[in-house]
UniProtKB/Swiss-Prot annotation:
Protein name listed in UniProt: Homeobox protein HD-4
PANTHER family for this protein: HOMEOBOX DOMAIN-CONTAINING PROTEIN (PTHR24324:SF9), HOMEOBOX PROTEIN HHEX (PTHR24324)
Protein's cellular compartments: Nucleus
Pfam families: Homeodomain (PF00046)
Region span, Disordered: 82-101
Length: 132
């Protein structure tokens, strides 16, 4: 069983990060193009494995915690869905069979808890090396 104090500390930390990022102009997308960091791609990919269509709240939380604009998050998910569909079509055409590809169950508008997003960020393999 998880220590409730650790959960409360994680929520408090996520809240402080959200407050800080809300005051940044970079959150509003006023800066130029920036490449996504490894940790941003890692977290976005893990969320994409859970749901290809995250809810508005999930996109907002990701944007704040990853220091990206909500629109950038939305575009990333659109592009990832497109790549995923292309890979599925390519796989079906390689099989050369007229069989119908099994449809994946799509979970739409799933809200991923902030605790899980924070845990993903903190559990990133080289998180301990960030800032060194």
């Amino acid at each position: 069983m998880k220590d409730p104090r650790w959960i409360m500390e994680g929520e408090a930390m996520a809240g402080l990060v959200k407050l800080r990022r809300l005051s940044d102009k970079s959150y509003l997308g006023l800066s130029g193009y920036r490449y996504k960091t490894h940790i941003q791609v890692y977290v976005l990919t893990k969320i994409f494995e859970i749901t290809q269509y995250p809810s508005h709240d999930t996109r907002q939380n990701l944007a704040i915690l990853l220091n990206m604009s909500p629109r950038t998050i939305q575009i990333w998910f659109q592009n990832s869905r497109s790549v995923s569909r292309g890979a599925a079509k390519k796989k079906v055409s390689k099989d050369n069979g007229p069989q119908e590809a099994p449809k994946a169950k799509i979970v739409s508008n799933l809200t991923v808890p902030v605790k899980y997003i924070t845990w993903l960020i903190l559990s990133y393999p080289s998180y301990s090396q960030i800032g060194n």
